[in-house]
């Protein structure tokens, strides 16, 4: 009998608590807060679909400026700027290119591939030039600088230095420390 009474009291208390809880929930207000949305039209929308393909495009003006600056450091060196992105290819064969990032390639002929101190100092000089390019001349986000240290056609060291990583983590490094920070044989 005692158990039955405890069960009844438990059920009544639970039902009362549930009823009170439901009564204290606030109903949604009639004033809905809607955030302002800014719509920016970039191109006229066409219903035509396209196929996306990774693509590269040359950046002739940026290439000339960087190549000239690199040749001032070493007349045997060369540099090239490339835009990386996507081609949107339509069914009629036409296409549009969307830039994702700007990448660079810098080549330096060398006599000895063990001069890591000199290579690191070269990287520092080139990265200082690249990071001083006005941001409005860089399309998309920062990409990378690919360094080629070439002894001959078969003997070379090639690796990439992500520009933003250099700015964030390595701009104060030089010499062998900078070289080894990015070169992973």
Regions inferred by a protein language model and the residue ranges of each:
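Intrinsic disorder/low-complexity segments enriched in polar/small residues
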Residues: 3-5, 24, 32
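Polar/charged, Gly/Pro-rich intrinsically disordered segments
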Residues: 24-26, 55-111, 135-185
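Hydrophobic membrane-insertion alpha-helices, especially the h-region
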Residues: 10-21
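Protein-protein interaction modules outside structured cores
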Residues: 50-51
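N-terminal Sec-pathway targeting helices
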Residues: 1-12
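Short, non-transmembrane amphipathic alpha-helical segments
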Residues: 116-138
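Ser/Thr/Pro/Gly-rich low-complexity linker/stalk segments immediately outside membranes or between
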Residues: 26-41
């Amino acid at each position: 009998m005692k158990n039955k009474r405890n069960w009844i009291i438990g059920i009544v208390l639970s039902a009362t608590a549930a009823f009170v809880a439901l009564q204290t929930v606030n109903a949604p207000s009639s004033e809905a807060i809607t955030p302002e949305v800014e719509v920016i039209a970039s191109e006229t929308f066409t219903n035509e679909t396209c196929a996306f393909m990774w693509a590269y495009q040359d950046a002739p003006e940026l290439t000339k400026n960087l190549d000239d600056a690199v040749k001032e450091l070493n007349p045997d060196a060369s540099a090239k700027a490339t835009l990386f992105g996507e081609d949107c290819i339509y069914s009629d064969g036409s296409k549009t290119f969307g830039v994702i990032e700007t990448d660079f390639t810098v080549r330096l002929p060398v006599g000895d591939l063990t001069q890591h101190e000199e290579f690191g100092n070269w990287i520092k000089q080139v990265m200082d030039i690249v990071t001083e390019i006005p941001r409005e001349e860089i399309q998309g986000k920062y990409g990378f600088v690919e360094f080629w240290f070439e002894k001959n056609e078969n003997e070379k060291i090639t690796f990439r230095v992500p520009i933003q990583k250099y700015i964030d983590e390595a701009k104060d490094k030089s010499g062998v420390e900078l070289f080894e920070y990015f070169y992973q044989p």
